[in-house]
Amino acid sequence: MVDALIFIEALFLAVLALFTFAFVISSIWEGEKRAATIGGVTFCILLGGEIGLFALKTVGFFQSMPGLLILLVGLVFPVVALLLLIRTGQNPRALQGTKGYIVGEVKRFDEREQVFARNRSLPPGSEQYRMFYSEHPQWEEHDAKRRERGGPLGVPGAIDKPHEGPNVAALFASFSIPPYLGSSHIVQPEAHPHFHEEKISLSPEEATSRVKGFALHLGADLVGIAEINPLWVYSRRGEIFWDNWEDWGSEIEVSHPYAIVFAMEMSKDMVWTAPHTASVVESGFVYAKGAFIATELASFIANLGYFATANHLRHYDVLLVPMAADAGLGELGRLGYLMTKEFGPRIRLGCVTTDLPLIPDPPVDIGVEDFCRVCKKCAHCCP
């Protein structure tokens, strides 16, 4: 009996020690000093426990009543700890999508306040610049310093020496496609003349199946449907790319009831090069992929006889992260990104809004709120 309990305890400690050792190696490989330190200390404690277990067995300690009690507690405690980690129920807030997290009054977000619109679109000295910072003086000094450092992403290639030349060349090349797909007649396409303005009859079930299948065929990795919550529609236009300053500050209205939201996986190898330029090259590549998918998908829906608007890097009407959460692609993480079950936050999003009748997907609960409450790795790592 005692020998069996000792064997079970030793096996349990060995499994935990091996798991912790693998965690330490992974943390060292990722350059995560804090995680490696905590993991290393834990591994030493577990290894010490394993050695102590066999040392006490050798002297016959576990044949005594105190030794037997310690052995039983040593078995019960980790079992109870593991049971406490098992989720006993779903998170009702997550299952409501973004509605479950709204507290008080929420106003629609003005795209002009978005960091890229402020630092990339607003020319210093322009009328729009003066108008914006007269309304938001708290950001002017901070944004001016950011521009001096090269904008939202800094000076391209500054930390890549001596490889900055080809790296920056790849960076700008990776962002070269979306501008060609951002004009109004492309993001809001008309049907091909072949269809003579006729609607193709599809049930919501078949339309949903075909739309999702086409998006996956085009290269999306995840696809979901959401009913559009007006709160996640930008209130006013802020990103300007073709000197169409008459649109700056114009009200954005989306009359479409549905959003087709899709996610694309980013290369793990490329993302792990961050903060070097290769990680941004991957962002540009996946943004280009998203622009292609959204454009093709909107054109497909237009050919069916319905209205559709592509949302991608050069045209956004809606905030994609809350829309993706409502479409069941994942949950909002503490780091501000969508956390997916399949890829974590290592994704980019795209969207098409439409009046094509579709079947919405339910929001999901994958445990992100509970995980983020104890992890906080983003808070420790963010500069």
Ranges and model annotations:
Residues 221-383:
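Catalytic cores of enzyme domains
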Residues 1-230, 234, 238-239:
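Iron-sulfur (Fe-S) cluster-binding modules
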